[in-house]
């Protein structure tokens, strides 16, 4: 990539920093997660949570959601201008679970947003620490990616539900900045653009006037983000066409869907970061660990290390399998929802099962669920090896893949063949090949057809022992390629509902 020199690393995006060297990046990322940890400890004190209750992932999620809601300016403003019955725009809260007489009970708490903002700033040296907020958003997004399927959303925008491997970050709020944009999959960006174009088709004033100019800027910015994810000239050239269109309409939607499909073989670069629940950072800070001094990275050994010695609990519903709940959270912690299960299993050291076979629902408990029979268990979040997270899609080649998911988006930089089912994917490319983008389409299809199965991605990259923090001895695993590797295969998971 010619533009590599102008790119900021994702730690820089994450911490909003300008160009920094590796040590400065490690320090500023450390400062960010340390701030999250300090905030969490303070909140546990405010809410009077016991040590055990503070390690409950459901409590962590409630506290994270409270601070995100406290800083959601546009929604806060909207709530103040459009008061709705029974909703205090100045307050935020959620369910907190406490242990009483050997049982778990749910208690709804309510706090002033102002108070939450004060505690957050105090934990972050008086700053707004937007990077920390984005970090929490990405953790929630990774958890959603591992938990829910987006079939409905894909179908609504005219995309194929089997393209789910392109949907990383599809539930991230718009305000998640550069760090958020970096982790969004190609399908997510395409979906956002299609929604925008559809509004323009239905609403004549969408692109007009003062607001329309702002809309247009946003549209072009999103096109550029998506263009930057593609690794071939033809895909990028097509994105230029989409961006420069005078009046975006159905032709652009067609082009975008074509590009999304092409990304199943000619993969985009999508960043992956291990973002952990706030309680994990809280535990480390409470035990005296100084993140800023020690430095921290979201893409190296650090998150694996942290999970190796953190004990986090989760509420378990009566018929759920605690091991499966652990797998779900482990995948979320390492943003591995779209990774090949064989690679993840090797790193974790235990076999991961496809989502359709998981006996567990989401981590969060709905307000109408009965707490009587709820139990809690330790989440097993440790791993056997660690591996570097990738921001590239890997080079592209072919291998037998499943009916439920026809490609993967690699998370770990580990040598392997990347599976995709060529017949299924190529079948989608018959038909419409005229119009302005025909030569680019032809070129893209040619590249896809010539993608070779024997090509190995991430050549020579391997996993590392947890004692090998400098990544000196890569272990290149060999995978049983006859096996099924996709997580969303034969799926029956719940849909994501806002």
Curated annotation (Swiss-Prot):
This is Nucleoprotein. A motif (Unconventional nuclear localization signal) lies at residues 1-18. GO terms for cellular component: helical viral capsid; host cell; host cell nucleus; ribonucleoprotein complex; viral nucleocapsid. InterPro entries: Flu_NP. A motif (Bipartite nuclear localization signal) lies at residues 198-216. The lineage of its organism: Viruses, Riboviria, Orthornavirae, Negarnaviricota, Polyploviricotina. Late in virus-infected cells, may be cleaved from a 56-kDa protein to a 53-kDa protein by a cellular caspase. This cleavage might be a marker for the onset of apoptosis in infected cells or have a specific function in virus host interaction. It comes from the Viruses. One of its GO terms (biological process) is viral penetration into host nucleus.
């Amino acid at each position: 990539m010619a533009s590599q020199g102008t790119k900021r690393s994702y730690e820089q995006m994450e911490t909003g920093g300008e160009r920094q060297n590796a040590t400065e990046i490690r320090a500023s990322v450390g400062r960010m997660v340390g701030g999250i940890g300090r905030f969490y400890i303070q909140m546990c004190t405010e809410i009077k949570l016991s040590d055990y209750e503070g390690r409950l992932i459901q409590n962590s999620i409630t506290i994270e959601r409270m601070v995100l809601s406290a800083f959601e300016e546009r929604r806060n403003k909207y709530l103040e201008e459009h008061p709705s019955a029974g909703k205090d725009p100045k307050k935020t809260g959620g369910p907190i679970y406490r242990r009483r007489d050997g049982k778990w009970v749910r208690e709804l708490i309510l706090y002033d947003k102002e108070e939450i903002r004060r505690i957050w700033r105090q934990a972050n040296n008086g700053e707004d620490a937007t990077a920390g907020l984005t970090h929490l958003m990405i953790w929630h997004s990774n958890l959603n990616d591992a938990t829910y399927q987006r079939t409905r959303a894909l179908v609504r925008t005219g995309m194929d539900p089997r393209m789910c491997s392109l949907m990383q970050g599809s539930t991230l709020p718009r305000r998640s900045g550069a760090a958020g944009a970096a982790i969004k999959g190609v399908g997510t960006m395409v979906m956002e653009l299609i929604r925008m174009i559809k509004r323009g088709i239905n609403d004549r004033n969408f692109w007009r006037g003062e607001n329309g100019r702002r809309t247009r800027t946003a549209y072009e910015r999103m096109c550029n983000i998506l263009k930057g994810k593609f690794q071939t000239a033809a895909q990028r050239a097509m994105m230029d066409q989409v961006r420069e269109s005078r009046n975006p309409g159905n032709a652009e939607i067609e082009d975008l869907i074509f590009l999304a499909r092409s990304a199943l073989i000619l993969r985009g670069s999508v960043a992956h970061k291990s973002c952990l629940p706030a309680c994990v950072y809280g535990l480390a800070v409470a035990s005296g660990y100084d993140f800023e001094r020690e430095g921290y990275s979201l893409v190296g050994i650090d998150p694996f290390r942290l999970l190796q010695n953190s004990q986090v609990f989760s509420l378990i519903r009566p018929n759920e399998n605690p091991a499966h709940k652990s797998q779900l959270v482990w995948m979320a912690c390492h943003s591995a929802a779209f990774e090949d299960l064989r690679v993840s299993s090797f790193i974790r050291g235990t076999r991961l099962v496809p989502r359709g076979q998981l006996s567990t629902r989401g981590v969060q408990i709905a307000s109408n669920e009965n707490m009587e029979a709820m139990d809690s268990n330790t989440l097993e979040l440790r791993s056997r090896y660690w591996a570097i997270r990738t921001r590239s899609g890997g080079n592209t080649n072919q291998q037998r893949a499943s009916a439920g998911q026809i490609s993967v988006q690699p998370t770990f930089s580990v040598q392997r063949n990347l599976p995709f089912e060529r017949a299924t994917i190529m079948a989608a490319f018959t038909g419409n090949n005229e119009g302005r983008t025909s030569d680019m389409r032809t070129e893209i299809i040619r590249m896809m057809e010539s993608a070779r199965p024997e090509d190995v991605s991430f050549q020579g990259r391997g996993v590392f022992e947890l004692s090998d923090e400098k990544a000196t001895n890569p272990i290149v695993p060999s995978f049983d390629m006859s096996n099924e590797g996709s997580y969303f295969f034969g799926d029956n998971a719940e849909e994501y509902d806002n």
